[in-house]
Amino acid sequence: MEAQSFGTLNYIALFAYLGAIMAVGVYFARRQKSADDYFKAGGRIPGWAAGFSVFATTLSSITFMSIPAKAYTSDWTFLIGQYVAIAILPIVFWFYIPFFRKLNLTSVYEYLERRFDVRMRLFGSISFMLFHIGRIAIVTYLTALALMPFIDISPLMIVFLIGVLCIIYTFLGGIEGVIWTDVIQGVMLSVAAILIFVVICFNVDGGIVEVFSMSNQADKYFPAEQFSWSWTDSTIPVLMIGFFFASLQQFTASQDVVQRYIVTDNIDETKKALITNAKLVACVPIFFFAVGSALFAYYTQNPELLPENFNTGGILPFYVISQMPVGVAGLIIAAIFAASQSSISSSLNSIAACFTSDIYEKVSKNPTSEQKLRIGRTLTVVAGLLGVVASTYLIMSNESEIWDAFNSLLGLMGGPMTGLFMLGIFVRRANANSALLGVVASIATVLWVRSATDLNFFFYGVIGTLMVVIVGYLTAPMFKNNLNSDEIDELSATKEKRSTTAEKA
C-alpha cells in the first residue's frame, strides 16, 4: 500500500515534540559537572519521576504498537505478564535494592565482583552492553519499518530522527535529562493510548459497550484453552512463569532499570519509584489492549476501510494516520517516537555507565571525575552511532534475520545474569568458581534446549536462571571461598533488614 500523506500540521506536531525533547537535554546539560551527576543525577531525582522513567524505559515503540495488534488478532492473555511484573516488586525492594544502595554502585555489575570476582563482573557488563547496542538497532529498525507504509518519511530519516536526537539529548543531559524526558514520554504514551481508545469508541456504532461486547462474543479476552498447561505454546501458566523470570531479570540484573534505584536521595524515594511504576503498569497497558479490542470492533463494522491483504501488525499506525484528526495524528506518531526514544536513551546512558565503571576505571589509574564524565559522554556517542549504523545496515540490506539471530543469542545471557545475582544474594556458600561453572552450564543448557527441542522460548530464562543457582550451589564445596564470613554477611540477604533500617535512620 502507498504511504499516507502526513500533512503539514502533523509534521508541526511531530517536530514540536522533537524540539521539546532537545530543549530538555540542553536544560539539564548545565548540571552535568561530574560523573556522579551524569550517571546518578547526584541523587536529585524524586521517586515518582524515577518510577515514570522505569515504566517508559521498559515500554518500547514495538510494544506500543504490538500490544493493540495482539489484542486485535488474538486475545488479552499477554496482559497477565504485566501483573506478574508487579508481583515481583516486593522481592526487588526487600532483597535487592538495599544492596545496590548500600554499596553505592554506579554499575550494578560491581556487585558481582565484590561477591564473586572480576570475571563475573565483566561477563555481566559486556553481555549487557552488547545486548543493548543490538537493542538500539532493533528498536530503531523495527520502528522505522512499522511506520514506513503509513507516513511519507523515509525509513532512513526515521532512524536519523530517533537515533541522532537520542544521542544528542543523552550526551547533553546525562541520566537526569534521560529521566525527565522519560517522564514526558511516559505521559505521552499514556495519554495517546487513552485518546486513541476514546476516539475509536466514538466511531463504533454502539460505543464502548459494543466494543467490549463484540470482543466478548468473539472470545478475545481470556479463552478457556489459554488456561491449560503447554510446553510449547504461550498459555497463561507459561506466561506467568516466563514473565516472572523475565521481569526478575529486568528489575534485578539490567543496568538500565537498576540505575533508577540509585538516582533518588534515599531508599524511601526508591520505594516511591517502584510504587509509581506499579501503578502505571497496573493501569496503562489495559488501555493498549482495549485499543486492540476497539480496533477489532471498528474494522469488523467497517471492513471496507482495510486494504486487501493488510498486515495487521501495523493496524495501530494505519488507524492513526487514516482516521485520527490532523494534528492529533502527528502527536500520536510523536508518541510512537517517544516510546522508542525512551528505551534507546536509557540504553545509551546505561552502556556509558557500565563501560566507564566496569572497564575504564579498571584500566585507568585513579581517573578523575571529569575524566570519567568525558569517557561517559564519548561512549554515549559511540554506542548510539553503532546502533544507528547497524539499524541503517539492516534497512539497506534487508538482512534482519541475521541480526535477529545475533540479538536472540545475546538475549540468552539474561538468564545467567539473573541467576548470578540470585546466587550471590541468597546462597551464602556460593563462590567465584562455582558461579563460573553455573554460568557455563546455564549457557550450554539453554543453547541445547533452543536447538534440540520445541520448548517455548519463555522457558529459556527460567532454565538459564535456575541452572546458575543449582550448579553454583552444588559445586560450591569444591572450591575455597575468597570471602570471609563477615564479607559474605555484608553481601548476602542475611543482613538485609539491618541494612534497610540503618539507611532509613
From Swiss-Prot:
It holds the Pfam family SSF. Disulfide bonds: none annotated. Keywords: Cell inner membrane, Cell membrane, Ion transport, Membrane, Metal-binding, Sodium, Sodium transport, Sugar transport, Transmembrane, Transmembrane helix, Transport. It is found in: Cell inner membrane. It comes from the Bacteria. It is a multi-pass membrane protein. Complements an E.coli nanT deletion mutant. Belongs to the sodium:solute symporter (SSF) (TC 2.A.21) family. Symporter that uses the Na(+) gradient as the driving force for the uptake of the sialic acid N-acetylneuraminic acid (Neu5Ac). Might play a role in persistence after colonization. This is Sodium/sialic acid symporter NanT. It comes from Aliivibrio fischeri (strain ATCC 700601 / ES114).
